[in-house]
Structure formats: C-alpha cells, structure tokens
C-alpha cells in the first residue's frame, strides 16, 4: 500500500501524502464524504452510478467539488498503479480555517482526493459470512440522510466489537424496529420468490441497484420496504451486497443467491456496466 500513487488537490502524490491533516474538520468532525467504485479485470464498474452518488453526497454536505475529469484521473491512477481488481476511492473533506474555530466553517478549505488500492471480499476465504441481527441502532435519516455516504461509522464499529463470538459481522435496526444495513453492506431477503431490501435509514447501494436490474431483466420481484426483524427468521435466504464483495453469501444463502451471483458476474463484463481504462 505504501508504494501506491494517489491524487490530491490537483497533484499525483505518494498515497501516504494524500490524507487529511489531524486538524482538518473532515478528520475531527467527520465533515467529509466519499464513494468507492470497483474495478473488475481492468474495467471500471458502474462508474456513472458511483459518480452521481458521490456528487449528490458532496452537495448534501455542502462540500464544493473541484471541476475535474474523473475518468481521466482514474485512468492515470490505473496506469500508475496497474491493479486489475481494485477499488477506486473518491473523497472530499473540509480542512481547517486559519482561525482554528470549529464554527468558522465557511473559511475552511475543501480537499479532494482519489486513490486506487487492491480489492478484498467481505470474507477472505470466500466462504459464507456469518451475520448477526444486532439490537444496536442505526442513525436515523432524520439526523442526516443515510443515502448520502458519510464517514460516521461509530454505531457500526461499536456493535461490531460486541457481536456474538460465532459471527463475522452485524446488521443494525432503526429506532422504529426495522432492519437497516451493516458496516459497508446492504442486506437482501429472499422470501417466496421475492427479494426485499430495507427502504429507510440505510444507503441505497450501487450493488443492490444491480440486483434490482437483475430482477427487472428476469422473472423476479424486487421491493424496497420497511422490514421487521421477524423476516430474519422467515426468509428463505439472506444475502449481502457491497462494492467490495459484490453479492455475498451468508449462513442463510442458497440457490437463489448463487443465481444472483452468476448474474452479477455477467454484468461485471457487460458493456452497459463497464468503462474501459
């Protein structure tokens, strides 16, 4: 990782020089947003969807993005760091004003960075991931809109650290008692040939949007809705989606999840979804 080249504020630099200052509001106040796009076999996947979400998130948090050619930067990063299966990170965060006053937000400069690094699955050995439905609470949309990506993972981290001993990760609920998402992934439920995923208090992930595409192109039904914890026991199958793991099996996955994985892999090679680098 230390020998990678990144991009920050108009320059290509060693990745170790692309991060925030410890005084930056993006670091001490989570005043930042980001997005992560996968590269499969040297091709960017769902570039427009990731960029559109990144731009929308930056607008939501009032972080002014520079006028840059994103694809050009990605191609140069890929040229300098030729990793065929990777992540591209887009990041923007608020720096600190000369006054140092945390209320002097308007005078804090905006920093923008991008970098590429090797990808990793949710579980290194590719085995199903064991997921626990936690009674921990996800931050509500009424506090800040969870469809805008943010750096505030504290509720995920806290509950991940106290998960059951036989589980790899957790899914949180909201204050109304509905299932939301896990740290870095959406959750999908298969029940009676329908696919359900949470509607509120969660990120609407790009990978889950590809699952929705699969259902539109094939005889399957997809619905975003409020999901009670009972579904955890009723569902025929449970799967996870993320930019890092694509469609990932859990201890509750079966043939439908395997079919979704096959369809997803097809799309990682399809011209409608990929961009040449």
Show which residues each predicted segment covers:
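Ordered, amphipathic secondary-structure segments that act as subunit-interaction surfaces
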Residues: 79-92, 99
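Helix-start/capping segments and mature chain N-termini
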Residues: 1-76, 98, 103-277
């Amino acid at each position: 990782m230390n020998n990678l080249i990144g991009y920050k504020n108009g320059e290509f630099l060693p990745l170790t020089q692309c991060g925030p200052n410890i005084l930056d509001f993006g670091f001490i106040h989570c005043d930042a947003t980001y997005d992560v796009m996968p590269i499969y076999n040297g091709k960017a996947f769902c570039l427009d969807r990731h960029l559109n979400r990144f731009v929308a998130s930056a607008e939501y948090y009032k972080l002014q993005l520079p006028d840059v050619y994103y694809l050009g930067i990605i191609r140069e990063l890929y040229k300098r760091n030729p990793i065929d299966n990777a992540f591209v990170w887009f990041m923007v965060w608020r720096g600190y004003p000369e006054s140092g006053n945390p209320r002097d937000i308007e005078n804090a400069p905006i920093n923008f960075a991008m970098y590429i690094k090797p990808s990793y699955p949710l579980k290194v050995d590719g085995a199903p991931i064991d997921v626990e439905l936690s009674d921990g609470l996800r931050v509500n949309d009424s506090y800040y809109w969870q469809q805008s990506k943010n750096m505030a993972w504290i509720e995920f981290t806290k509950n991940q650290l106290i998960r059951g001993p036989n589980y790899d990760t957790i899914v949180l609920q909201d204050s109304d008692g509905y299932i939301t998402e896990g740290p870095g992934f959406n959750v999908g439920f298969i029940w009676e040939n329908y696919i359900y995923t949470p509607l509120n208090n969660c990120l609407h992930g790009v990978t889950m949007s590809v699952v929705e595409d699969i259902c539109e192109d094939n005889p399957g039904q997809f619905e975003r809705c409020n999901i009670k914890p009972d579904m955890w026991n009723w569902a025929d199958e449970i799967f996870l989606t993320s930019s890092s793991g694509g469609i990932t099996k859990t201890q509750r996955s079966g043939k439908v999840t395997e079919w979704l994985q096959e369809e997803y892999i097809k799309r990682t090679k399809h011209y409608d979804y990929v961009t040449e680098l």
